[in-house]
C-alpha cells in the first residue's frame, strides 16, 4: 500500500505529476499504484530508497537548489515525458520541496504540450501548485524555452 508523497499533484492527469522529494519506499509504491513508471529527479543527490521499486525508472537531471535548469536539461525532460506518455506511462518529477525546479520543468512542459505562452504556463503551474517557480532565473528559463520552441 502506497503513501502519498509530499506536495504530490497531477498537472496532466494520468500523464505528468509534480512532487517533493520522496523519502519512503511507500512513496514510490504510491507512484506505481497511480501508473507513474518514470521519476525525474532534479536534486543534486538522488532520492533515498529509489531502488525499492524496480518498476519505477529513475532519471537524474541534477540542478542546484534555486537554480534554473539548463536548456539541454529542459529538452531531456520533455523527451522523457513525451516518450513515456507515448507508451501510456506517467511521469513524476521532483526536487526537494516540489516548487522551484519542479515547477519550472512543469511550466516548460505546458509550453510544449499545450502551446501556452511562458507567462500563461507559469500562471497555470502556480494555480495548480501554489508557490511554484521561486526565482526570477527560473521564470526566465521558461520564457527562454518558449522563445526557443515557438
Swiss-Prot record:
Entry keyword Protein biosynthesis: no
Class of the enzyme per the UniProt entry, highest EC level: hydrolase
Which catalytic reaction applies to this protein?
O-phospho-L-tyrosyl-[protein] + H2O = L-tyrosyl-[protein] + phosphate; O-phospho-L-seryl-[protein] + H2O = L-seryl-[protein] + phosphate; O-phospho-L-threonyl-[protein] + H2O = L-threonyl-[protein] + phosphate
Instruction: Pinpoint the Tyrosine-protein phosphatase domain residues.
Output: 7-150
Q: What is its main location?
A: cytoplasm
Q: Which GO terms describe its cellular component?
A: cytoplasm; cytosol; nucleoplasm
EC numbers on record: 3.1.3.16, 3.1.3.48
Its BP terms in the Gene Ontology are: cilium assembly; dephosphorylation
The UniProt record lists the keyword Cytoplasm:
yes
Per UniProt, the keywords (alphabetical) are: Cytoplasm, Hydrolase, Nucleus, Protein phosphatase
**Which GO terms label this protein's molecular function in UniProt?**
phosphatase activity; protein serine/threonine phosphatase activity; protein tyrosine phosphatase activity; protein tyrosine/serine/threonine phosphatase activity
Q: Name the SMART domains for this protein.
A: DSPc (SM00195), PTPc_motif (SM00404)
Q: Which Gene3D superfamilies match?
A: Protein tyrosine phosphatase superfamily (3.90.190.10)
> What highest taxon heads this organism's lineage?
Eukaryota
Active site (record annotation): 95
Describe the function of this protein. Protein phosphatase that mediates dephosphorylation of proteins phosphorylated on Tyr and Ser/Thr residues. In vitro, it can dephosphorylate p44-ERK1 (MAPK3) but not p54 SAPK-beta (MAPK10) in vitro. Able to enhance activation of JNK and p38 (MAPK14).
Family of this protein: Belongs to the protein-tyrosine phosphatase family. Non-receptor class dual specificity subfamily.
Name under which the protein is recorded: Dual specificity protein phosphatase 23
